[in-house]
Amino acid sequence: MVYGSTWKNWPELTKFAKQQEALFIPSVGPGYVDTRVRPWNGQNTRPRRKGKYYEESWEAALAARPAAVSVTSFNEWHEGTQIERAVPRREGSFRYEDYSEAGGPDFYLKLTQRMVAKFTELQF
């Protein structure tokens, strides 16, 4: 684990950055699994846990009281980092991450909207 990506370190990093007149911007993500393209990289897998991983990463970010939060997500469906609308799909033995168990195709967009609203409330 990298120090800056470890959630428990985010309050300290935020404080340190402020002392240096700099910014620490924590980055949250929905999960990660790239073993389909990098089979040796299983130690970096972060299961989504029906949205709990994403929500917990947001809560950790909000607890640090940063000036901004970034969302690490892209259309890297093979890495499971997407938050856009998703429906179940298989390609051979590979099953793409979808949100049917978590709450539907828009689950992560709605969760992002809720967490951004919480972040906005903390800023004012």
Regions found by a protein language model. Name each.
Residues 1-124:
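Glycan-processing catalytic domains of CAZymes
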